[in-house]
A protein has these predicted regions:
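Residue-level signal for the nucleotide or nucleotide-sugar donor/cofactor binding architecture
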Residues: 13, 107, 186
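Functionally critical, mid-to-C-terminal surface segments that flank or help form catalytic/ligand
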Residues: 252-294
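Short, acidic/turn-prone active-site loops that include or flank metal/cofactor-
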Residues: 69, 87-91, 108-112, 132-134, ...
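A charged N-terminal "starter" segment
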Residues: 1-103, 117, 125, 165
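Active-site loop/helix belt of alpha/beta enzymes
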Residues: 6, 41-58, 113, 117-118, ...
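Structured catalytic cores of enzymes that bind and process phosphorylated ligands/cofactors
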Residues: 99, 105-106, 142-145
């Protein structure tokens, strides 16, 4: 850190605390349950490469990112464990998925066909995880009551495409971090019933996962073949409604600064934009150099 930077604001990242959180969360899982550590968005601002390397060293089974560029950064930095891309990757970027050995989420048959063609043209096989939308209403093959067999047929067609290997099947909880977990349990029930329907029709996808951070902590029954741990790795609870006594997490990031200016103000003085703070008494006011760019 330069002398000038020391006079402003910085973040300190503790890989020891990251290790504590990983090990604490891992201890909640069955021995054969795989651990996917999320490194999207520069590892939630903590430094994707440093976090990815540490999670691999700790024994994480897989990492997950939002886009293929994030996966490529990890590969260039020496990460070797499997990486799942959770976002939608345009088929024209399929070469990057293959080049960096990235497993791709597929949410519709049309995209799957395009990725399969690209993989065949390269003489390669692309691993995929099939996403089922059971209630988040974002990416994923749409689950709808009465339409399960139609969706199952589309996924069967996807899994039969040469050039693709369907390694995983998953869904994402929308409300597992609320006091009332019944909406998440409804999603879990839909997913399990749909997975059974696929099996009954001869479609075997070996790795099934539902739990995000909140599900991992609060819904042990949802910790299937794997879990996807995101914000909890970094020591942050998914919401104020998640019971903190269940698991002790330690914040991985500390934001630090210096006091750059001190002044005395009198009772009733309005402070800063909009005057949103009114001094309740005569007091000293300290300013720290934290702004948009810090």
């Amino acid at each position: 850190m330069t002398e000038t930077a020391q006079m402003r604001t910085w973040a300190e990242i503790s890989l020891d605390r990251l290790a504590h959180n990983y090990q604490t969360l891992r201890a909640m899982l069955a021995p054969d349950c795989r651990f996917l550590g999320l490194c999207k968005a520069n590892a939630y601002g903590h430094g994707a490469l440093q976090v990815g390397r540490k999670l691999e060293a700790l024994g994480a089974d897989m990492l997950a990112v939002a886009c293929v560029d994030e996966a490529a950064e990890l590969r260039r930095g020496g990460v070797t464990i499997p990486i799942l891309c959770l976002g939608q990757t345009p088929p024209q970027l399929a070469e990057l998925l293959l080049e960096h050995d990235v497993t791709q989420t597929v949410s519709d048959l049309e995209t799957g066909r395009a990725l399969a063609r690209a993989a065949q043209a390269a003489g390669r096989t692309l691993k995929i995880h099939v996403k089922v939308d059971t209630g988040m209403t974002r990416l994923g093959f749409l689950w709808r009551e009465g339409g399960e067999r139609e969706t199952a047929a589309a996924i069967a067609a996807l899994c039969a495409l040469p050039g693709l290997e369907a390694e995983g099947l998953f869904t994402h909880f929308a409300r597992a971090d609320e006091y009332d977990v019944s909406p998440a349990k409804t999603q879990l029930d839909r997913f399990l019933a749909f997975a059974s329907l696929l099996e009954e029709n001869g479609i075997h996808i070996p790795m099934k996962h539902c739990s995000n951070s909140a599900g991992l902590i609060r819904m042990q029954e949802a910790n299937l073949d794997a879990v996807r741990a995101g914000i909890t790795i970094y020591g942050v609870y998914p919401s104020q409604q998640v019971e903190k006594h269940i698991v002790e997490l330690k914040p991985v990031m500390e934001l630090k600064s210096h006091v750059s200016f001190v002044k005395k103000i009198t009772k009733g003085t309005a402070v800063s934009y909009g005057g949103t703070f009114i001094a309740p008494k005569d007091m000293q006011l300290a300013t720290i150099p934290v702004g948009y760019a810090d």
